[in-house]
């Protein structure tokens, strides 16, 4: 697994950015910025520490797929740590086997820093070799979309 890092500065208070990124006041804000990964991107579950959460979308065949994850840490307005430990395929959760093993135990962490009303988000994530290029191309665009949402 490769460690990747992305960041963006957003001219909005950290509370607004955190709530929009996680879709806490409206899931639509989460779905809007993550639509760059999958136009039907959403989540089922809770952002509470220790909770299971599914990051899901529908593929071109109309089948639901995505990732099975756990919120390892959530310090409101400061830090969120997500551990991916399975996948959703054809609407079924798979948490073991060769497909899962290559990227299971990967983390995706969000750090929020306030600097005089400007919020910096730092995203640290683990990616398998076959996803590095995709993440390097897509994650910055998704963070720019989040910036656009928060600065409205």
Predicted features by range, described:
Residues 46, 60-115:
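Hydrophobic-ligand binding "helix-grip"
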Residues 52-60, 82-84, 123-125:
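Short beta-strand segments that buttress and anchor functional surface loops
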Residues 101-104, 120, 126-152:
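A conserved amphipathic terminal alpha-helix motif
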Residues 42-53, 62:
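A solvent-exposed, acidic/Ser-Thr-rich amphipathic alpha-helical stretch
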Residues 85-90, 124-130:
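Short, solvent-exposed aromatic-acidic interface loops
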Residues 9-13, 56, 113-115, 124-128:
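Solvent-exposed residues in well-ordered beta-strands and their adjoining turns
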Residues 1-41, 48:
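Hydrophobic ligand-binding cavity/cleft-lining segments
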């Amino acid at each position: 697994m490769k460690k990747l890092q992305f960041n963006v500065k957003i001219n909005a208070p950290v509370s607004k950015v955190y709530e929009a990124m996680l879709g806490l006041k409206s899931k639509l804000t989460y779905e809007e910025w993550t639509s760059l990964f999958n136009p039907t991107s959403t989540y089922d579950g809770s952002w509470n520490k220790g909770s299971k959460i599914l990051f899901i979308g529908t593929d071109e065949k109309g089948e639901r797929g995505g990732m099975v994850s756990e919120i390892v840490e959530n310090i409101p307005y400061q830090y969120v740590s997500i551990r991916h430990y399975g996948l959703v395929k054809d609407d079924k959760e798979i948490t073991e086997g060769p497909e899962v093993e290559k990227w299971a135990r990967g983390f995706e962490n969000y750090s929020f820093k306030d600097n005089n009303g400007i919020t910096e988000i730092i995203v640290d994530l683990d990616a398998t070799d076959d996803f590095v290029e995709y993440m390097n191309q897509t994650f910055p665009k998704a963070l720019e979309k989040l910036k656009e949402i928060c600065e409205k």
